[in-house]
C-alpha cells in the first residue's frame, strides 16, 4: 500500500479506463429514498457514461428524462493497494500470484442535475477501482468501481463494472 502522485504512466492508464453503462445505487436493505440522502428522485439503477476528462473523472448518470453529472477532480496523490490474497490464482506461464488491487481517490466533488441539491461546500468523494493483476498496473486489471459521496447534505454510494478500456493507441 502506498500513496503516490500519479505519473504520466498512471495517468495514461487512467485515461484508458471507461465506466460501464450501468450504475447501481447501494441501499442495503433500505429503500432508495431512505438510503440516498441528497440525491433527488433516487433510483436503484442508472445509466452511466464516465471517464477521465482533463484532470477530473466526469460521470453522467441518467434515469429516464433526469440526469446529473459528478465531477471528481484528481487529487495530488492516490492510494495504490495490492495484496496477495492467497487464493492460489496465477497467470498462466508466470509463477507469481495474481494480486487483488485497488486504486483509491479522494477529494471534493462537484455536481449538477439531480446531484446539485446535495452537493454543498466540502462534500467529498471516495472513488475505488478494484481488480486483479500482477505488480504492474494496467487499465485492464480493473473491472469494478465503487463511489461514495458524503457531506453535510449528501450520503450515498454507487457501484458497478468497468467497460473494456480504450486501446492504448486510441487514447493518444
Predicted ranges, named:
Residues 1-172:
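Cysteine-centric segments in proteins
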Amino acid at each position: 500500500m502506498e500513496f503516490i502522485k500519479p505519473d504520466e504512466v498512471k495517468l495514461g492508464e487512467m485515461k484508458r479506463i471507461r465506466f460501464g453503462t450501468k450504475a447501481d445505487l447501494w441501499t442495503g436493505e433500505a429503500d432508495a429514498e431512505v438510503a440516498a440522502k441528497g440525491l433527488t428522485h433516487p433510483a436503484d439503477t442508472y445509466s452511466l457514461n464516465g471517464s477521465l476528462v482533463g484532470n477530473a473523472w466526469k460521470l453522467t448518470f441518467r434515469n429516464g428524462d433526469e440526469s446529473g453529472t459528478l465531477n471528481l477532480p484528481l487529487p495530488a496523490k492516490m492510494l495504490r493497494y495490492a495484496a496477495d490474497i492467497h487464493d492460489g490464482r496465477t497467470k498462466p506461464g508466470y509463477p507469481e500470484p495474481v494480486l487483488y488491487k485497488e486504486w483509491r481517490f479522494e477529494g471534493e466533488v462537484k455536481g449538477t442535475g439531480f446531484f446539485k441539491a446535495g452537493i454543498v461546500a466540502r462534500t467529498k468523494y471516495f472513488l475505488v477501482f478494484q481488480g486483479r493483476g500482477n505488480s504492474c498496473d494496467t487499465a485492464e486489471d480493473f473491472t469494478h468501481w465503487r463511489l461514495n459521496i458524503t457531506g453535510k447534505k449528501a450520503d450515498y454510494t454507487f457501484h458497478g463494472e468497468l467497460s473494456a478500456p480504450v486501446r492504448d493507441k486510441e487514447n493518444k
